Regions:
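Non-catalytic, well-ordered alpha-helical scaffold segments
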Residues: 9-13, 44, 73
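Charge-rich, solvent-exposed alpha-helical interaction surfaces
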Residues: 15-18, 46, 78
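Short amphipathic alpha-helical interaction segments
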Residues: 6, 36-53
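A short, conserved structural fragment
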Residues: 51-62
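Short, amphipathic alpha-helical interaction segments positioned at domain boundaries
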Residues: 71-85
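Minor-groove-contacting beta-hairpin "wing" of winged helix-turn-helix DNA-binding domains
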Residues: 63-71
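A short beta-turn/loop motif at secondary-structure boundaries
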Residues: 35, 62-63
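Short amphipathic alpha-helical interface segments
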Residues: 4-36
């Protein structure tokens, strides 16, 4: 994935919110832009941005498809910051 500089706040919140529902640290959430209600470019940009900032306990990128694990402490803090500001 190729990241742009400024992902949408709403796109970041959508991905972080979806990942916040993961309780098992071995589970990965396949990111699907249609299921998240995002544009493909918006989802890819936000996912790259969040992965680069270590917002997930783990992630996987295979054949252009991205999956993320539960939120890391950084991810929980970023979600709280984005949702409350």
């Amino acid at each position: 994935m190729k990241a742009m500089l400024n992902p949408s706040r709403a796109d970041c919140i959508a991905i972080l919110s979806a990942a916040s529902r993961i309780v098992d640290h071995t589970t990965l959430l396949d990111l699907n832009y249609k299921n998240l209600g995002l544009s493909r470019n918006g989802m890819e940009t936000a996912a790259s941005f969040l992965i680069e900032r270590a917002c997930f306990t783990r992630h996987r990128e295979v054949d252009g498809l991205t999956a993320v694990g539960a939120l890391s402490l950084q991810g929980r803090m970023r979600l709280d910051q984005l949702a409350n500001n």
